[in-house]
């Protein structure tokens, strides 16, 4: 997998080098086609890339939103189950600021989505802040909660080391 800088408004796009045509998959919410055990995005022609969540987290945490990602197969390497390896590799290179304002979504009113015993709620806030609580039936994981605020570049120390669980 190789990451290349892209011009403003390019977005985040995966290019499947193992496919000869219809091999570009844009990383946007409407292209998410599966979220069971990992996140998969697909284009209109059925080309897909899975296990994108750790790389996408690293890119978001490092404020990278215009990048071309060349990949030789249908899955992003899972590495150690966190995004820290991606962050460290990106930190070893240089990034460039683009001469254009970033497009940022601003939550203006409360939005809540519920599905069975699960829910998510977005609330207006001047900073990026996450509160979550999760309660698994397993005694191994059970109930957990966390409060995070992403400020002053703390993504690497406060989020990137978070591991997945099975």
Q: What do the PLM-derived regions correspond to, one by one?
A:
Residues 1-164:
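Short acidic-hydrophobic catalytic motif
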């Amino acid at each position: 997998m190789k990451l290349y800088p892209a011009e403003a408004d390019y977005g985040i796009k995966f290019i499947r080098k193992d496919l000869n045509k219809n091999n570009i998959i844009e990383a946007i919410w409407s292209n998410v086609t599966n979220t069971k055990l990992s996140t998969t995005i697909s284009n209109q022609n059925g080309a897909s890339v899975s296990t994108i969540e750790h790389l996408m987290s690293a890119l978001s945490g490092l404020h990278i939103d215009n990048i071309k990602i060349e990949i030789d197969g249908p899955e992003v390497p899972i590495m150690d189950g966190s995004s820290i390896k991606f962050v460290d590799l990106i930190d070893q290179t240089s990034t460039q600021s683009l001469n254009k304002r970033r497009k940022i979504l601003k939550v203006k009113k409360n939005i809540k989505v519920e599905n069975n015993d699960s829910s998510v709620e977005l609330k207006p806030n001047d900073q990026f802040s996450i509160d979550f609580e999760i309660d698994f039936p397993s005694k191994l994981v059970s109930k957990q909660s966390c409060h995070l605020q992403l400020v002053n570049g703390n993504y690497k120390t406060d989020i990137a080391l978070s591991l997945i669980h099975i």
